[in-house]
Amino acid sequence: RLPDVQILKGNVRFRHDSVWMYCDSAYFFEKQNSLHAFGHVHLVQGDSIEGFGDILYYNGNTKLARFRNHVKLIHNEATTLTTDSLDYDRMRNIAYYFSGGMIEDSLNTLTSLWGQYTPDDNQALFKGEVQLEHPKFVLNADTLCYNTESYQADLVSKTRIVYEHETTILSSNGWYNTQTEHSMLLDRSLILHADGMTLTGDTIYYDKQAGYGKVYGNMQSVDSTNHMTLYGDKGEVWESDNHGYVTDSAMLVEWSDSLMNIYMHADTLFTDQIPYQRCDLIAKDSVLVDTVWQYPAPDTMWVDTTYLQIRAYYNVRVFCEDMQSVCDSVHYNGRDSVATLCGNPVCWSEDNQVSADTVKIYLKNGTVDYLHGIGNAIAVKQEGEREFDQMAGKEMLAYVQD
């Protein structure tokens, strides 16, 4: 027999304030205003909180309930916390575990070594080997804040979000709504796709379901398939339409297999992946336009699923090993590897210069093959300090040789 202790057995019930506690047996310490409950422990607080476990140590003065062994805490029948050891502070309405635990809601399952849950605001804090499992993705972090009502995860440490065989998101600051899959990613976060596309920037708003991203500050978008990188201060991408643009200090770098990089600067740059369409290239009973520029063509064309299209507007400058160019706008068509320069285009290579109303640059194997000047075409070559060779015409072809 223990002094100052009441021993109760069989369908034991306690009431303290608005809380009911049930168990198989208990030690009640009346002077200390505390109890030890054993076997099928069940705590009920109002109509929102229920706690279960094998053992409960409850202090009526501090209102601290310590559950041990096979512990489960249920909030509003929507959120369930499962662990082996749980302390529930009724005074502050905070529950926390410290030897590994799990919180489940209607959408996600979260596990960690240490965790804290606040029923008042549905907010949870996880630390140590944190993992969030969603039907579509898995999130891993060292520390994570999560709201079981809004399903929003606040990223406060290095975090990896993986959509298997599809997309990986790396961030250390921001938020990710696991229900809508909308996110705000800060501090140079990175989005990687399985097809080789990547997106990074100081701040990224990303809608995973819509495949849409908007970047503010030091944007960098890499297209490994087309060997191309876009830079700028801000821009947007639409993954489903394979469309994107970048503006404010915009630059495009094309790094082809030929190892010759092409640099393009402009106020604004647009890139698109255009679907190929099978079509007849030789029409029957056609009338030829009176021009000297006639080239043989195949009967039909079906090369690949898509081709690259680039558009650059205002104050365009292009630099590569073979040639440099300036103009007001550029349109590049990857289907036939032709770049069309408009708005006072000027192209030069060493001592040679070509200008016209419109200049078309034809590429071959990643290098410049020849130029086609259309309208007021002029070619100039410097032969001496004050000597120049000049040639002018309505149209002109200028070939680039090594």
What is the predicted role of each segment?
Residues 1-402:
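N-terminal amphipathic/hydrophobic interface segments
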